């Protein structure tokens, strides 16, 4: 799997840096701005690294949002790809993982040691919080997967001076697989 580092700019553009192009850990490093061409006045706001099949919840402080896969945000251009439409005075909110795209793989534990694998199911709900202290949750199926980006749907109605503080995808349950007492396989569903 080839992972990509996505850089979300304050102008709504998404910049792609192949992880293999990042400097090694033993050097002095280099600023991310040497690997991408940011427009004048644009700041990198958020970063996300993952495989192409990962689905993210993208939102802006204006209260709009949508779902998108990393594969749709990729660009070979150093200037990035216009993907999230943000209005004047709005900011891009931190992306939230909806689905990893495939089940996590685990390696067997050495003999005599217990191993636990946590399976992350795709998110089932979205929680939105406004700067005015309001919270709204709804099922994630109400959102669109937008391959070309854009503004999206209204996530939460905002008061005139409020903004969207953030939106996060979550699941109401987690399934844990592991080795229990006596070396027997065990599975737990946490609601």
Protein language model annotation of sequence segments:
Residues 1-191:
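Short, structured "edge-of-domain" segments at secondary-structure transitions
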């Amino acid at each position: 799997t080839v992972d990509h580092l996505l850089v979300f700019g304050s102008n709504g553009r998404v910049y792609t840096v192949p992880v293999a192009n990042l400097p090694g850990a033993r050097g002095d490093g280099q600023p991310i701005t040497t690997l991408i061409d940011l427009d004048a006045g644009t700041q990198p706001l958020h970063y996300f690294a993952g495989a192409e099949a990962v689905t993210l919840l993208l939102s802006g402080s204006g209260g709009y949002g949508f779902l998108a896969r990393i594969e749709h945000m990729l660009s070979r251009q150093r200037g990035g790809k216009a993907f999230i439409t943000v209005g004047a005075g709005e900011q891009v909110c931190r992306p939230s993982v909806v689905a990893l795209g495939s089940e996590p793989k685990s390696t067997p534990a050495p003999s005599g040691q217990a191993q636990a694998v946590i399976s992350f199911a795709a998110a089932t709900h979205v929680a939105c919080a406004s700067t005015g202290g309001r919270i709204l949750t709804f099922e994630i199926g109400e959102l669109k997967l937008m391959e070309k980006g854009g503004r999206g749907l209204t996530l939460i109605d905002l008061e005139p001076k409020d903004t969207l503080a953030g939106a996060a995808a979550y699941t109401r349950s987690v399934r844990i697989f592991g080795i229990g007492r006596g070396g027997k396989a065990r599975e737990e569903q946490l609601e």
